[in-house]
Amino acid sequence: MNFKYIVAVSFLITSGYARSVKNDEQSLSQRDVLEEESLREIRGIGGALLSAGKAALKGLAKGFAEHFGKRTAEDHEVMKRLEAVMRDLDSLDHPEEASERETRGFNQEEIANLFTKKEKRILGPVLSLVGSALGGLIKKIG
């Protein structure tokens, strides 16, 4: 009788532990899915902000070009830099196409780190270039 009781209790403990492990695995996979969804949302918001900023810069550059008509060599250089910045921003809108060759063998975490590094590497100079270009144009207006 004691042996049957010990076997039954052992079986109950084992099945309870197995259910616990299974629930832990499910909660971890659900947490991973939620983290991935939140990262997509954050990148989507960032992409929308970049698109809006890009459209504003294009409109501003076009407005300045129409307003001032002829450009000096310095203005021409600034506009060329702004156009290069716009191309860089376009590549950020479609990171899968732009960095597809670079990221073929990497895992997801390395891809996310690479994308973040590219954003930082491009956005820093872009913001300083845009700031200096706008500052120069505002000085000429004023």
Swiss-Prot record:
GO terms for biological process: defense response to bacterium; defense response to fungus; killing of cells of another organism. InterPro entries: Bombinin. Residues 19-43, 72-121 form a propeptide. The modification Isoleucine amide is found at I141. One of its GO terms (cellular component) is extracellular region. Keywords: Amidation, Amphibian defense peptide, Antibiotic, Antimicrobial, Cleavage on pair of basic residues, Cytolysis, Fungicide, Hemolysis, Secreted, Signal. Expressed by the skin glands. Pfam families: Bombinin. Residues 1-18 form the signal peptide. The modification Phenylalanine amide is found at F68. Belongs to the bombinin family. Maximin-y shows antimicrobial activity against bacteria and against the fungus C.albicans. It has little hemolytic activity. This is Maximins y/Hv type 2. It comes from Bombina maxima.
